[in-house]
Amino acid sequence: MKRKGLSVFFFLFWVALAAQSSETQPVNSVQLIAWLMAGVPSGRLVRIVKERGIATVPGKDQIHQFEAAGAAANLLQALAASKPSKASSEASEIPTSLLKAAADAKAQRFHAAELDLHPALTADPQNAALHFALGGMLIRQEQWDDAFDEITLATQLMPDLPENHSSLAYIFYRLDDGPNSISEARTALSIDPQNAEAYQFLGLALYSNGQYAAAVHAFAESLARDPANADTYYDLGITLRAGGNQAAAITAYRQAIHLNPAFWEAHSNIAVVLHEQNKLDEAIAEYREAKRLAPEEASVRNNLGNTYCDKGDFDAAMLELRELYRQHPEWQQGHGCLARAYLSKRDYANAIQELQVSIRQNPTSSSEHRMLGEAFVLDDKLEEGIRELRLAVRLNPDSDSAHHFLGTALFQQQQLEAAEKEFREALRLNGSPDNHYSLAACLMTMDRYQEALSELDAAARLDPERTLYRARREELVKLMKETNSR
């Protein structure tokens, strides 16, 4: 990993120096279009023009170039109404390669935009805005080390631009370096206390550090300055959920959708919260909307399939997951859910196949080995089932269901003492009626009727509505009387 940051002293030194130099220097069209293509909002660029001035007023051709690059109406109006700064009257042509890069960035062809920027940087290697633009393209490709290098260069060349520091804050956040991320975001805010993006990235950094209340406050400060930012509401929703406030999280996600109706990730995250609340029908509706907006997104179809499984709608689950693997054969999740669907259809062969795939991807999952063992037992493959169930117990000795199913398999193999041991361990871990009943069945087979009767009494006492327990108790009492009368 490359060096993760410059010292706070280094930045404060350059910021102090910048107060005497960069702060009074007007910006030019090259810088503005480079910042624009890297994602700096038009409203923020308007403020930069007002604060710093502009070297030369763009002509009609350049205004059209800004419009083609994605400038909003407020920036176009500000440029057209601007007056040249007295500090400079030098014209600034926008390089063709930069215009091409801006067009590619607008079309989300980020790698092409990255390549387009190289000629412009070769011609002007000390241009901080061009390094910032290149860093922005690398960020969008998640090339964090290279992005760090470019944004660091931009910061060294123009240390008083808060966007340089907030971009570093975001890179550090993605590198899971919360302290440096917080430091950079606060540096950005020390330069520009009204910078909404810096507050947003401060919120992300605090969230990554587990400081949820402070993160919520930072996001609120960001939204106070940029209330139409759907991404910030989305980040706020994630943080509120992490802090345990599910209702507020859903409200934040819905506000993100209000601002950006195509925000499928927000629909998906609402569904996650609803699933956690066991509101499965509502969760399914949100996942379906996310799927409508992003039909090729594998995670949405996977989560929708799993929610159908939890609801017990195995036909719908199978449709979703089969389509998922058709679209994305490389996708590795969801095989356990598909196995459950096959088990519900008593299609043990396909269930076993899916569980074996799932176990290859996660060999230490006790629950997957337990399900595979159960499938083998149901398919009358007791030896294979016992092997998997013993492994499930070793991986998670505190799983009552693993002990229960292992006991069941051993019982079917007439290994009664071993089965009794597993049933008793399952009962120790979970005193459920079914665990009492299974132990009773084992004890009855071993002719230990009095002990079996005690277990059946316990099962019936715990679940008096279950007629099976009472019926089996009556059978046992009758059997005991017949045995005693002989």
Predicted features and spans:
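Structural signature of tandem alpha-helical TPR/SEL1-like repeats
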Residues: Q108-L115, Q141-L153, R174-T187, S208-E221, ...
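Terminal, low-structured helical/coil segments at or just beyond the last alpha-helical repeat
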Residues: T445, L453-R486
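Bacterial N-terminal signal peptides
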Residues: S7-A16
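Helix-start (N-cap) detector for alpha-helical repeat units in TPR-like alpha-solenoids
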Residues: I94, A128-A129, P162-E163, A196-E197, ...
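Structural marker of alpha-solenoid helical repeat scaffolds
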Residues: A123, L157, I191, R225, ...
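General marker for long, soluble alpha-helical cores
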Residues: A19-T122, A129, A133-G136, R140
